[in-house]
């Protein structure tokens, strides 16, 4: 069973899937948050990857003061984006606890590996443009999923209207893409894969990102960090990723956590009590 890292104050999880972790009601959401609190995690953004899970993400955010939500339809499921789904997502975007529109984006990996189950790239692109428009209209951050679609993603983001913040979640692209994203002012969010042994380039990217363009996430129940790679992930385990990123940046993890928490609050427009 994975264990949290040492207690680190002021941690935040910029992208997790509480419903996929098993937290599908208020009581179970509270259990996950309690475990996260014990590891130093103060705030969590839970994400929907389809309309049903977006509803659960918003319900989780409504049920707990330390949870906020991101709502969208995942690019692989973009064929679900019918008129009713579009109308509902616009409603969700206006909710005060929906802090980002996501995850949306482009994914060619699953087009190649599961073409019958995955929306074609043209459908994904149209859905992405819809979500961008929703984010701009609502004044919310845009949360991007990108899997092996760097050039097309940069093209779409470059010619579409610009949301206040664009987050590249679970950043995994090459250094050249990172440099372009940084130059455009995007926020790069790093998940547990930054801890993987063979991901030295990703650690170098985490080291070069300006501190005010950096978030950390679990992407739970996926992307469990070393030393528990392959096990089921949850927000309580984000400290392992924070320690890795702090080491890559040669800075104390406490300072990293404070800076990333400030970014979380700014990008997601979290009102101070």
Stretch-by-stretch model annotation:
Residues 1-273:
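Mid-domain alpha/beta scaffold segments of enzyme catalytic cores
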């Amino acid at each position: 069973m994975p264990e949290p890292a040492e207690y680190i104050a002021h941690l935040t999880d910029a992208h997790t899937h509480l419903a996929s972790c098993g937290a599908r009601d208020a009581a179970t959401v509270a259990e996950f948050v309690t475990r996260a609190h014990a590891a130093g995690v103060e705030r969590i953004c839970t994400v929907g990857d389809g309309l049903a899970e977006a509803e659960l993400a918003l319900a989780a955010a409504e049920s707990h003061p330390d949870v906020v939500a991101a709502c969208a339809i995942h690019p692989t499921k973009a064929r679900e984006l019918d008129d009713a789904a579009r109308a509902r997502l616009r409603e969700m975007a206006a909710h005060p606890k929906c802090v980002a529109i996501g995850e949306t984006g482009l994914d060619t990996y699953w087009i190649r590996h599961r073409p019958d189950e995955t929306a074609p790239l043209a459908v994904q692109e149209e859905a992405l443009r819809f979500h961008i428009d929703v984010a701009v209209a609502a004044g919310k951050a845009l949360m991007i999923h990108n899997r092996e679609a760097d050039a097309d993603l940069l093209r779409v983001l470059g010619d579409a209207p610009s949301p206040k913040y664009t987050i590249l979640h679970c950043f995994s692209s090459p250094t050249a893409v990172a440099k372009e994203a940084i130059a455009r002012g995007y926020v790069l969010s790093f998940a547990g894969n930054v801890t993987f042994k063979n991901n030295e380039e990703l650690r170098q990217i985490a080291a070069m990102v300006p501190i005010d363009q950096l978030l950390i996430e679990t992407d739970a129940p996926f992307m469990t960090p070393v030393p528990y790679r392959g096990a089921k992930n949850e927000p309580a385990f984000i400290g392992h990723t924070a320690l890795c990123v702090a080491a890559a940046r040669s800075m104390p993890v406490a300072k990293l956590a404070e800076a990333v928490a400030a970014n979380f609050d700014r990008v997601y427009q979290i009102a101070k009590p």
